[in-house]
């Protein structure tokens, strides 16, 4: 067996950082919220062998944000018309029916109802 070369595998001394002043703090990274992990999970359920580029993910994230804002605004408007201060699942359901066309609205309402039922039974 050949002898090991000196220095190979030897641990290097840790570099010492310059001491910070008492007022200096490391800047905390701001969190960017997105729907990308959820979009990815749904995509893998529907098409397990398909990938998605970061640009396509950005477009999908913008789309989900846009639809969310439209539904929230419409639900808020409906609650205001009925002199209610709370947006309930009824307002959201009506907003979805108003915003989405035909069959898409029916599917969205049924999936939403299913999600709300699952949530209430798990509590």
Curated annotation (Swiss-Prot):
- Positions of the UniProt region annotated as Disordered: 1-32
**Could you describe the post-translational modifications of this protein?**
Monoubiquitination of Lys-118 gives a specific tag for epigenetic transcriptional activation and is also prerequisite for histone H3 'Lys-4' and 'Lys-79' methylation. GlcNAcylation at Ser-110 promotes monoubiquitination of Lys-118. It fluctuates in response to extracellular glucose, and associates with transcribed genes.
Tell me the keywords, alphabetical order: Chromosome, DNA-binding, Glycoprotein, Isopeptide bond, Nucleosome core, Nucleus, Ubl conjugation
Query: By its UniProt entry, which PROSITE patterns does this protein fall under?
Result: HISTONE_H2B (PS00357)
List cystine links.
none
The reply on keyword DNA-binding is yes
InterPro entries per record: Histone-fold, Histone_H2A/H2B/H3, Histone_H2B, HISTONE_H2B_site
Biased composition annotated in UniProt, kind: Basic residues: 9-18
Superkingdom field: Eukaryota
- SMART domains from the UniProt entry: H2B
Attached carbohydrates are found at 110
**Signal peptide annotation:** none
Q: Which GO terms describe its cellular component?
A: nucleosome; nucleus
Its function, per the record, reads: Core component of nucleosome. Nucleosomes wrap and compact DNA into chromatin, limiting DNA accessibility to the cellular machineries which require DNA as a template. Histones thereby play a central role in transcription regulation, DNA repair, DNA replication and chromosomal stability. DNA accessibility is regulated via a complex set of post-translational modifications of histones, also called histone code, and nucleosome remodeling.
The subunit structure is: The nucleosome is a histone octamer containing two molecules each of H2A, H2B, H3 and H4 assembled in one H3-H4 heterotetramer and two H2A-H2B heterodimers. The octamer wraps approximately 147 bp of DNA.
| Stated name of the protein | Histone H2B
Organism for this UniProt entry = Holothuria tubulosa (Tubular sea cucumber)
């Amino acid at each position: 067996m050949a002898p090991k070369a000196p220095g190979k595998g030897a641990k290097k001394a840790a570099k010492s950082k310059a001491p910070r002043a008492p007022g200096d703090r490391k800047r905390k990274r701001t969190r960017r919220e997105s729907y990308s992990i959820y979009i990815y999970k749904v995509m893998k359920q529907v098409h397990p062998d398909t990938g998605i580029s970061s640009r396509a993910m950005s477009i999908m994230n913008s789309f989900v944000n846009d639809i969310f804002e439209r539904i929230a605004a419409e639900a808020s408007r409906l609650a205001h018309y009925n002199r209610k201060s709370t947006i309930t699942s009824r307002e959201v359901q009506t907003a979805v029916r108003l915003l989405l066309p035909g069959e898409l609205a029916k599917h969205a309402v049924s999936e939403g109802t299913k999600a709300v039922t699952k949530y209430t039974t798990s509590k």
